[in-house]
């Protein structure tokens, strides 16, 4: 059975960018191109991949009948974003169906984060491996969940990570099903910079055209690989 609805999760590249006047995103454009109804949307600006993986699974478990009708679009973001649940209900109003609220820290977020990572560096942290594992593990984890439940999906990188140089990281990366991962060698972020499709260079996010063109390529990839079913 082909999907009738779409579910979208990721970072700000899959949300409206109101302050830049961008009232669309690649997921919404793909939704129109595929002729699907909205099933669920949990993308959140500034959030990372742990939240994407966890909230997608929770949504599916709570909405089993709707999940069976969905095509899933997952934007895997930068591995520099480390998610954690909070006790203060942060931005809970945006996701009323979720009991947990989430925040994210990164190596350069603030003084406290920088100090924490300085401490980790004294323990010989390999920051590149940490970032890469954060992204790749979420992608592999979710792809296995989708395949287990026979949910059709497509993934892509919204923001790129550093090149892989470690053999263990490469082995995990090789577990990603590239048939369902659009342009794994690049990202939506790289694409808009290369093609001058940025809404605001002060904080680069896609312009309307940047969202539309990416969605069109996603649609072509989905159709060429018969990804509507699994």
Which residue stretches match the model-derived regions?
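Serine-esterase "nucleophile elbow" of acetyl-processing enzymes
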Residues: 1-57, 62, 213
């Amino acid at each position: 059975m082909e999907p009738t609805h779409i579910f979208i999760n990721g970072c700000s590249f899959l949300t409206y960018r109101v302050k830049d006047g961008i009232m669309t995103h690649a997921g919404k454009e793909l939704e129109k191109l595929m002729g699907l109804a909205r099933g669920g949307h949990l993308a959140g600006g500034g959030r990372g991949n742990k939240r994407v993986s966890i909230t997608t699974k929770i949504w599916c478990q709570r909405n089993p009948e709707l999940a069976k009708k969905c095509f899933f679009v997952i934007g895997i973001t930068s591995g520099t974003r480390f998610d954690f649940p909070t006790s203060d209900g942060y931005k809970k109003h945006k996701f009323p169906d979720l009991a947990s609220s989430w925040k994210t820290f990164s190596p350069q977020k603030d003084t406290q984060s920088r100090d924490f990572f300085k401490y980790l560096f004294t323990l010989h942290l390999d920051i590149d491996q940490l970032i890469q594992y954060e992204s790749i593990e979420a992608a592999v984890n979710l792809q296995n969940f989708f395949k287990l439940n026979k949910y059709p999906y497509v993934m892509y990188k919204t923001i790129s990570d550093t090149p892989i140089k470690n053999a263990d990281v490469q082995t995990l990366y090789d577990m990603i099903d590239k048939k369902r991962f659009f342009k794994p060698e690049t990202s939506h972020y790289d694409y808009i910079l290369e093609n001058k499709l940025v809404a605001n260079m002060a904080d680069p996010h896609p312009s309307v055209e940047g969202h539309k063109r990416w969605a069109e390529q996603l649609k072509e990839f989905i159709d060429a690989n018969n990804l509507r079913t699994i």
